[in-house]
Amino acid sequence: MTSRKKIPLNRRSFMARSACSAMGLTGIVSTLAHMKLMQGALANTSSSLNDYRALVVLFLFGAKDANNFLMPGLLNPSRANYDTHRGVLALPTGGTNPTHPIVASNLATQPSAPAGAEYFELHPSLPDVKSLFDSGDLSIAANVGTLVVPTKASTYDSVALPPQLFSHSDQQNQWQSSLPDKPFQSGWCGRIADILHPQNTDSAISMSVSLSGINAIQAGLTQVSPQYSVTNAGAVTLGGYGNKYSSALTDSQDKHSYKSNSSGRRLKAFQDIMDYTHDHLFEEGYNNVVRQARENEGYVGAALEEADSWLHPTAQDSRGRPWPFMTATFLYQHGIDPSGLNNSNISALGALPDLARQLLKIAQLIAGRRCLENKRQLFFCSYGGHDTHQDQGGYSGNGVYVPGDLDANMGVLNDALKAFNDCMHALETFENGQNDAFSYDDFILASHSDFNRTLTPNGNLAGPSGSDHAWGTHVFTMGGNVRGSNVYGYYPDLDPAGVWTTPGSSRGRWIPTCSVEQFTAPLAKWLDVGDSELATIFPNLDRFSSPFGSTYNPSGYDSMLANPNMDFLEGI
């Protein structure tokens, strides 16, 4: 081992050397993709980003039943097919479990839209999502899915289709890569990080932060901004040194403030080892990972402490101490009175669902963003359990609603989105007048899911019945630059044996009218990915009609494929 010395290396040199090293480690196809990304990144090194923007991707694993997430309203031309074919899973607009009506403003003013096309209903467990939609904070994109090329029922048997079309694992990877016709190498967020990383000057941690472990969507090709995992409790710490290193350090934010006890001496010895270089490449590689983890831990810890210094004006714990604003907001939204809890005990948050804890941590990291020093941040979170082949929930023959898994899942989603959105609005108000103040326009949350589920149920009993694997699904976006109160794309006619569904099936598997890249490319552009780099991040995008327009033409499948109607973001 030798003493560590810094070797002067600017970004351009580092990236060039990284590209050269890749030539000996990957195949020619991977290397060409790598080089394209490096070329795009090098082209951006002369510019920098002056504002802050955070993209949050929420993946609903298991394939949520989008047919009961967004339903046609009573006046919608698709309603008759919904009532006829949804069977025991159908959710009437009245009854003991009423749905929530919404009106798509863009379709209400669209002359070419069929009469009543603007009327929809949201699942009964989504009252706050209805409010988000009505207020303009949230929009929905209909019938999005993985596509190799534009596809319709008449070409289904003659064009290339996404491999393993109805397989969970394959479709999850294809949504995250946006390259369904290629073996997985990287995710679309990872490729964005490859391109934008050079403009994130002086960043403290990676652009790519995951609250749901290592994932596919943030996997890059160049590894200049590898994904960094944070738990619901914060950064992963070294074990054996107490909470926030209280047994070894006098100041948790100063990694050299060692105590004179055995824990302090042990941590100092460990730190000294990390300050050496190692001749063995594996040893040095491991050492670098541990060292970077310790540094990231400090930055994340500082960001979370910064966020928690913002106190709620009324919420106090069982000892009369004020709660951090964001934590109290999430607790209140989930019906938990924080006054009976001890806010120094992290287990108090155990009553929150996992999705809520993930979004709470993301909200805190956004509030503490100055400690992370990234102008662009990519967050990933997830919520599983949506594979409702049974026990989905529906009405029995005597008109009594039998609650199921979809009800519980939508309730968790509703509360988490509402609490997160409330925190983003409140953060804008709290920081008003500060330097680099946060704006509600500074974030977008976008959902993904494996695929939709069949319109027709797989049984005729409300309790045990569910739905099966399908294709085109409905996703949503939330944030200040989202053109809210609108439904984009094209909503299916819900005829399970018609032109919208896959041939040979009478279950209602909608062929997507919008590809994953047509939905995600606007998100990349919002992050300031240049037009010339979009083709590098989304190589298949030019196979489809441009999503950067508001043209709407529902006169036929060809017209819909030519006019995707994905103009859901402002300022791009």
Enumerate the predicted regions with their spans:
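Short, conserved, surface-exposed binding loops centered on an aromatic residue
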Residues: 370-373, 434-439, 462-468
